[in-house]
Amino acid sequence: MIDSEALESERVKLKRDIADLRANLNRKEQCLRELEAAIAAGEDSDEAEESSNDMPTPQTKLTNDDIARYSRQLILQDFGVQGQLKLKNSSVLIVGMGGLGCPAAQYLVAAGCGHLGLIDYDEVERSNLHRQILHSEHRCGMSKAESARIALLELNSHCQIRCHSRLINSMNAMHIIRPYDVVLDCSDNVATRYLLNDACVMLRKPLVSGSALKMDGQLTVYGYGQGPCYRCIYPVPPPPEAVTNCGDGGVLGAVTGIIGAMQALEAIKLIIGLGDVMSGRLLIFDGSSFMFRNIRIRTKRPNCHVCSAQPLITELIDYEMFCGMHATDKDNPLDLLEPDQRLEVKEYHQKLQSQPHLLLDVRPPAEFEICQLPRSINVPLSEILDDSYLKRFAKQLEDKELPIVLLCRRGNDSQIAVQHITNRFPAHSIRDLVGGLHAWTGSVDATFPIY
């Protein structure tokens, strides 16, 4: 018997794939045209840029164009011509051309930073555009570093920009960071934070660190003067299951804009020696109440493994192994359950979906409202962990034969939930849906929305 519903789903999937391929081809062709135009205008290729760590000869005077362009900051008493010259001869490396890196780069280039390095291994996606303001719809599929470079050169063609379209790691970090004066950590993962911290301490580079999640943001400067480094504050990385990035927790684009702009400001202050640097202090921004708090953080740790007088770590290590998580902002898939506690989406669709079962969606209510599987019941992970779900499902839990399936967006929170429920009800059949709703879209129903 022909399953017309399955055939229709496959037809829709193929049509969508073909449309995506055509759109991607158009984007790639547009990107190629822009790159060729940039090269024709005299921009160096990546290979030529990265073949040497030497920065151009320092400039000793401002041009008429400089004076006209930067006049509003030149007239600042604490900035002036000498400040602009320092900025013109400076070099800043931005790691991560996402929600923080884009506004930071934009303001540094606009202010007249002479040399900018951009690092990002990833490509532009549509889900980036609400906060990563240098990218555009027609550059989806393009390297983020290259996309940002195109936008930045339109803003200020006098800035020298190097693109590093790769993942920064223990093998290349020292070589990449060495020629720059200041490093901005605009990444979204713990492993990269430790990597940048250690490399910057070893190379004596100040590290301007920013982060943003949901409606909140933070900013500080590590490894500057007598201030602490990142390891002084966090000598041991958090467990992977305790880490939330903006892909999981969400973020409002304007929040990343605020923090990224402040990272640019701190970099400018470091370069020209303006004001008090945020070393030894942490700026906390609460976007919900629009409150800023400036708190003191601990001083240098005398026995810090990296920045102390007798460091135990004198060369870069394997940071993914050290942190137990990937050095990217992509999903770090958890592996908490035994194979018999996991259920593939195709198996669920073909066998269990038509049988009596309890399907619990452990996403927050806001995410459940976006999309949900038929017959799924929303029970947020927080309710499972505090056991408030027990009264709600007391009757179903009495039936040890009733299969219980838990799902989430990508298959991580559902594993945590299965672990918790299984500890209380070890005799029940409780499984999680591998890969969550993303796997459902990829393997079962191509029309189901992805977010």
Curated annotation (Swiss-Prot):
Residues 353-449 form the Rhodanese domain. SUPFAM superfamilies: Activating enzymes of the ubiquitin-like proteins. One of its GO terms (cellular component) is cytosol. Pathway: tRNA modification; 5-methoxycarbonylmethyl-2-thiouridine-tRNA biosynthesis; Cofactor biosynthesis; molybdopterin biosynthesis. One of its GO terms (biological process) is Mo-molybdopterin cofactor biosynthetic process. GO terms for molecular function: ATP binding; metal ion binding; molybdopterin-synthase adenylyltransferase activity; molybdopterin-synthase sulfurtransferase activity; thiosulfate-cyanide sulfurtransferase activity; URM1 activating enzyme activity. Keywords: ATP-binding, Cytoplasm, Metal-binding, Molybdenum cofactor biosynthesis, Multifunctional enzyme, Nucleotide-binding, Phosphoprotein, Transferase, tRNA processing, Zinc. CDD domains: ThiF_MoeB_HesA_family. The modification Phosphothreonine is found at residue 60. Residues 43-52 have a biased composition (Acidic residues). Residues 42-62 are annotated as: Disordered. Its EC number is 2.7.7.80, 2.8.1.11. The keyword Transcription does not apply. It is found in: Cytoplasm. It holds the Pfam family ThiF. Binds 1 zinc ion per subunit. It catalyses: [molybdopterin-synthase sulfur-carrier protein]-C-terminal Gly-Gly + ATP + H(+) = [molybdopterin-synthase sulfur-carrier protein]-C-terminal Gly-Gly-AMP + diphosphate; [molybdopterin-synthase sulfur-carrier protein]-C-terminal Gly-Gly-AMP + S-sulfanyl-L-cysteinyl-[cysteine desulfurase] + AH2 = [molybdopterin-synthase sulfur-carrier protein]-C-terminal-Gly-aminoethanethioate + L-cysteinyl-[cysteine desulfurase] + A + AMP + 2 H(+). In the N-terminal section; belongs to the HesA/MoeB/ThiF family. UBA4 subfamily. Plays a central role in 2-thiolation of mcm(5)S(2)U at tRNA wobble positions of cytosolic tRNA(Lys), tRNA(Glu) and tRNA(Gln). Also essential during biosynthesis of the molybdenum cofactor. Acts by mediating the C-terminal thiocarboxylation of sulfur carriers URM1 and MOCS2A. Its N-terminus first activates URM1 and MOCS2A as acyl-adenylates (-COAMP), then the persulfide sulfur on the catalytic cysteine is transferred to URM1 and MOCS2A to form thiocarboxylation (-COSH) of their C-terminus. This is Adenylyltransferase and sulfurtransferase MOCS3-1. The lineage of its organism: Eukaryota, Metazoa, Ecdysozoa, Arthropoda, Hexapoda.
